[in-house]
Amino acid sequence: MTKEKLILAYSGGLDTSVAIAWLKKDYDVIAVCMDVGEGKNLEFIHDKALSIGAIESHVLDVKEEFAQEYVLPALQAHAYYEQKYPLVSALSRPLISKKLVEMAHKTGATTIAHGCTGKGNDQVRFEVAIAALDPSLKVVAPVREWKWAREEEIIFAKENGVPVPADLDSPYSVDQNLWGRANECGVLENPWNEAPEDTFGITTSPENAPDTPEYVDIEFKAGIPVAVNGEKLSLANLIQRLNVIAGKHGVGRIDHVENRLVGIKSREIYECPGAITLLTAHKEIEDLTLVREVSHFKPIVSNELSNLIYNGLWFNPATDALKAYLAQTQAVVNGTAKVKLYKGSAKVVARKSPNSLYDEDLATYTSADTFDQDAAVGFIKLWGLPTKVNAEIHKKS
């Protein structure tokens, strides 16, 4: 009997490798691994899927698409979930879902499988995105169905010829892409424990970072970072370059107890050296170029967009509407920010823009001042009139 085809979001780790062995009894498994900048040995992952029993194995390089279509809107929004987390994992899930659906259409598969547990955010992100893109596709979640302890999973792996990774003893669960690295589990589950140094993989400890600061010039055109220190780079390569430079200086370490979509609190350790550097630089160019009303309203939109992305609603009309508003603000965001990297800090120390709204002649307190200070008297009188009237009325009562 012909089996149905199934697309598996494959990472090469134990969970999704065991999933191939488990699913191949009922499905023709097509493994799909996306390169979003995690730095894995992709050829090994491709071959591993086939050796376990997948009928096809695909590795897709989607770094530039990830950077342009998913990271860039978040950068331009200054998107932080709960004002701390730059949405590292949350941003990659809609792209991965989109590619899984495309592969299902290409191969005639009827089902998609992922390796998420039943208590995380990613199961929601994948399944809601898949439903938005093609409601006819079925979704299975083997790890959620098994409810196995790690020991039981290892036994199944060994009995079914699934290679057990050498780094399985690592206490941490790690997810990495261009925009950063997420670490959880192990001693991190106790929020009173300071994260040990072996938690971190792409940043130097600020205490051990260079004793001399490094300055980086980041150029933006229409809100898009296009060059580092005068060198033009694709967006994906630019982010990777800053991950290395800023990571060396210990920039971008975040310790966050966050409210998960599924209703629990989770302690996460993030490393986002490139992201924090770019977010900091981009904000300073906006401060120079956006009118006050846009500057004051934009954070409200950004906060709502951050929540939508975190909660798995990338493919939602509300997300589209907010992204459209934010994109409209970026035409004037041109210029260069000089960022000082030093022992965990990324600080903009200078900025310039051809669209700058900063007028030194108006701002100066020297004799070159062109600001009409005599106009202040009338302005204050009119601006304060409602406050004055309110005070007078309440004083009478």
Curated annotation (Swiss-Prot):
MF (Gene Ontology): argininosuccinate synthase activity; ATP binding
Entry's EC annotation: 6.3.4.5
Catalysed reaction, written as an equation: L-citrulline + L-aspartate + ATP = 2-(N(omega)-L-arginino)succinate + AMP + diphosphate + H(+)
Protein residues bound to L-citrulline: 85, 121, 125, 173, 258, 270
PROSITE patterns reported in the protein's UniProt record: ARGININOSUCCIN_SYN_1 (PS00564), ARGININOSUCCIN_SYN_2 (PS00565)
InterPro entries named among the record's database cross-references: Arginosuc_syn_C, Arginosuc_syn_N, Arginosuc_synth, Arginosuc_synth_CS, Arginosuc_synth_type_1_subfam, AS_cat/multimer_dom_body, Rossmann-like_a/b/a_fold
Name of protein: Argininosuccinate synthase
Organism encoding this protein: Streptococcus suis (strain 05ZYH33)
Gene behind this protein: argG
